[in-house]
A protein has these predicted regions:
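N-terminal Rossmann-like or analogous alpha/beta NTP/dinucleotide-binding catalytic cores
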Residues: 2-125, 222-235, 275
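Structural motif
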Residues: 20, 266-274, 313-319, 352-360, ...
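Residue-level signal for inorganic ion chemistry
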Residues: 29, 60, 100, 104, ...
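Glycine-rich phosphate/pyrophosphate-binding loops
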Residues: 34-46, 199-212, 233-247, 461-466, ...
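Conserved phosphate-binding loops in nucleotide/dinucleotide-binding enzymes
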Residues: 83-87, 110, 189-190, 208-219, ...
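Active-site cores that bind ATP or allylic diphosphates and position pyrophosphate for catalysis
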Residues: 102, 107-242, 248-254, 262
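Small-residue-rich helix-loop
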Residues: 336-439
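Charged substrate- and nucleic-acid-binding regions of tRNA-handling and nucleotidyl-transfer enzymes
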Residues: 426-488
């Protein structure tokens, strides 16, 4: 498909949730295309049926849609170079492999699993790297045809040159060369007729006109074999962008097989999609020039400024604290009504009595870092927890259990006044403040005990008058009276 436009593809396997590293690959692939006004393609690589997970294709679709990484061509919307599901392209792979065999660039291998296991065991015993020994590499044509006619199981292997070097240029790691003698004759078609991952990638990418291949640095060692395939077919070699791994710590990679966080896990914990995407982009990539010190970027911002020269060669360590900080910044920047909409499901999971959610959210938003931590802050709304009266003692506010009883008794008539509008927080605060002035006390002397009386906690989403207005007059008066009784002993 000749074109001078950039064409990239994200080609995930439907094996479960969207791992952080996979989402980063999708993001970089999308940004590479969109920054250059190119085409972003979604292709589903489902030929490894042993790892296929039911429903995982929908996870891929939903994740990309939620994050705004919308594809221009793909299985659901079609395009000029479909089908976009690998298992629907099966007839191509055998055809291309047999073309290489006919041209002497690949060969049928009849070695059994038992022979290969014995070969590898012997190689390991001699301290060698395991590799295929080329047993079937130069079988006479007549013997090959006879064994094929007899129905003998086989694989098709790539015939790697034994001499010389194969080099390639990577946009991150630069020029890399590998001695051909160090490369194994890799399998292209397995005994069940299915293509291997490496072979299918090349045979899919070329007809789709892929110009830039973006993937993890673990594929650097396979890239010379990819190039030899491109050369064998006489096809143009795409640009390579290999990204450093995302690490859990200095020694261990993030891995969905080890239960490390997926995109779905992070959303379920209350991280915002936009914050996750922003943070993932910074895992192994840094902005340049005037944006070098900036950390908060919308997807539209990233489309404008992202270039592959910002990708690091060094592994990126997933830092949960950094993700929290970025998420907190996104929460603070939300319009109040949008924060309320996002926080409401978390509030409703913890509070089942009527409360002023708008006021609650006004107090939560400046303090909230992760939405999933909201419920644990609200466990006193439905029922007053048990607490010790020693909580009323506070040096800063100059309160004691005895002074708290005096303060609450002074507040009771103020809060009982039918004219006091509990829907207006400022009005309630001013009434309490006036009572403090009348008593010659500071506001905290009066309002700190009110907060304890209403929540049984030292830390709450809002001060005493905020809590009173969230709960309403009836609950407030019930709890203040109960607190006075508790303090009476």
């Amino acid at each position: 498909m000749p074109s001078n436009k950039v064409r990239t593809r994200f080609a995930p396997s439907p094996t479960g949730y969207m791992h952080v590293g996979n989402l980063r690959t999708a993001l970089y692939t999308y940004l590479m295309a969109k920054h250059e006004d190119g085409t972003f393609i979604l292709r589903i690589e489902d030929t490894d049926q042993g790892r296929y997970v039911e429903g995982a294709v929908d996870v891929i679709y939903n994740t990309l849609r939620e994050t705004g990484l919308l594809w221009d061509e793909g299985p659901d919307i079609g395009g000029p170079v479909g089908p976009y599901v690998q298992s629907e392209r099966m007839s191509m792979f055998k055809q291309y492999a047999e073309q290489l065999v006919a041209e002497g660039k690949a060969y049928y291998c009849f070695c059994t699993e038992e022979r290969l296991e014995a070969l590898h065991a012997e190689q390991r015993a001699h301290g060698e790297m395991t590799h295929y020994d080329g047993c079937c590499r130069d079988l006479p044509r007549e013997e090959v045809e006879k064994r094929l006619a007899a129905g003998e199981p086989y694989v098709i292997r790539q015939k790697i040159p034994r001499e010389g070097v194969t080099g390639f240029d990577d946009m991150v790691y630069g020029h890399i060369e590998v001695n051909n003698s160090e490369m194994d004759d890799q399998i292209l078609i397995k005994t069940d007729g299915m293509p291997t991952y490496n072979f299918a990638n090349v045979v899919d990418d070329h007809p789709m006109g892929i110009t830039h291949v973006i993937r993890g640095s673990e594929y650097l060692s396979s890239t010379p074999k990819y190039n030899l395939l491109y050369q064998a077919f006489g096809w143009n070699i795409p640009n390579y962008i290999h990204c450093p791994p995302v690490m859990k710590d200095a020694q261990n990679k993030l891995s969905k097989r080890n239960g490390d966080a997926s995109y779905q896990d992070l959303v379920a914990k209350g991280y915002l999609t936009e914050a996750i995407l922003n943070y993932i982009c910074l895992l192994g990539w840094s902005p340049k020039g005037e944006y070098a010190e900036q950390e908060i970027f919308s997807l539209a911002d990233l489309v404008k400024i992202w270039t592959p020269d910002g990708i690091s060669k060094s592994p990126a360590i997933f830092d949960p604290l950094k993700l929290r900080a970025i998420n907190a910044e996104y929460i603070r920047r939300l319009p109040p009504e949008e924060f309320l909409a996002k926080a409401e499901p978390w509030i409703d999971s913890a509070v089942h009595t009527p409360i002023n959610k708008k006021l609650l959210c006004a107090n939560l938003q400046p303090r909230c870092e992760v939405l999933g931590e909201i419920p644990e802050q609200l466990d006193f709304f439905d029922a007053m927890p048990e607490y010790d009266v020693s909580l009323y003692a506070n040096k800063k506010q100059k309160t004691t259990p005895e002074s708290a009883k005096e303060a609450l008794e002074a507040l009771l008539p103020v809060l009982s006044d039918e004219a006091l509008d509990f829907n207006d927080r400022d009005t309630v605060f001013d009434a309490c403040k006036a009572k403090a002035e009348e008593l010659g006390k500071k506001n905290g002397w009066l309002l700190y005990p009110l907060g304890i009386a209403l929540s049984g906690k030292q830390r709450t989403p809002g001060g005493g008058t905020d809590l009173a207005c969230m709960m309403g007059r009836e609950t407030t008066l019930e709890r203040v009276k109960a607190a006075i009784e508790k303090l009476n002993g």
